[in-house]
A protein has these predicted regions:
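Intrinsic-disorder/low-complexity detector
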Residues: 1-74
Length: 74
């Protein structure tokens, strides 16, 4: 059986990174990313994302949730 390993761009501010961060901080699923670094560049929201970007965000969110590693707020 052939399996294709999908690799995502994990740069800070990218779709995968933002999905991962949202899940880590227990924020709701809300696809977005930043054109450059998080919070210091233009934000791209769901309506303006490509299918591949949404897939990357979703993968980051899912992977982080599956890891079981979340921010401890205590």
């Amino acid at each position: 059986m052939n399996q294709t390993l999908v690799q995502y761009d994990t740069r800070h501010g990218g779709a995968y990174d933002r999905g991962s961060a949202d899940a880590y901080y227990r924020r709701s699923y809300n696809p977005h990313y930043y054109r450059g670094d998080s919070y210091s560049s233009a934000r791209v929201d769901l309506a303006d994302m490509t299918a591949d970007e949404i897939t990357a965000y979703t993968a980051g969110y899912r992977d982080q949730e599956e890891s079981g590693d979340f921010k401890d707020w205590d």
